[in-house]
């Protein structure tokens, strides 16, 4: 019997790579969150998704004044704000996967009220971890054909 030797996953998901984040999970992401993401990540998400920056900030619960302050101070978000951004990207990435890589359909779906979410749009629930988990749970059910 051969011994199992795990190798670290090196493949970074396309969305995470496109917006300049080092990894979609693992200790590299944890370290990046602790250090604080660059404020430029909001611009990168905006360019990738064509979502207005104000909508990204609303969905992440980060006031626009905080973004302005961070830009003039040290150019980095706090770890808490970085965690919120990672949550947004994680859910957006799952939505893009749900739609077979079609980010246009995923973005439209994210802003559409969904019966399975109490007639709320997925992006309106991302400000809290519990809301994001509900969205990810729904995505998982849709991927596996479980509609209850």
Swiss-Prot record:
GO terms for molecular function: DNA binding. The keyword Lipoprotein does not apply. It comes from the Bacteria. InterPro entries: Antitox_Xre, Xre-like_HTH, Xre/MbcA/ParS-like_toxin-bd. Keywords: Toxin-antitoxin system. It holds the Pfam family Xre_MbcA_ParS_C. Antitoxin component of a type II toxin-antitoxin (TA) system. Neutralizes the activity of cognate toxin Res. Belongs to the MbcA/ParS/Xre antitoxin family. Homodimer. Forms a complex with cognate toxin Rse. This is Antitoxin Xre.
């Amino acid at each position: 019997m051969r011994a199992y030797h795990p190798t670290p996953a090196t493949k970074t998901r396309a969305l995470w790579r496109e917006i300049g984040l080092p990894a979609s999970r693992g200790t590299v992401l944890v370290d990046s969150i602790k250090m604080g993401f660059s404020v430029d990540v909001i611009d990168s998400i905006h360019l990738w998704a064509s979502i207005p920056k104000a909508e990204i900030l609303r969905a992440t619960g980060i006031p626009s004044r905080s973004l302005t302050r961070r830009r003039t101070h040290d150019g980095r978000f706090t770890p808490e704000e970085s965690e919120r951004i990672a949550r947004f990207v994680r859910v957006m990435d799952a939505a893009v996967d749900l739609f077979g890589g079609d980010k246009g359909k995923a973005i439209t779906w994210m802003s559409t009220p969904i019966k399975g979410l109490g007639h709320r749009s997925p992006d309106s629930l991302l400000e809290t971890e519990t809301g994001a988990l509900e969205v990810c749970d729904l995505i998982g059910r849709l991927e596996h054909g479980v509609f209850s």
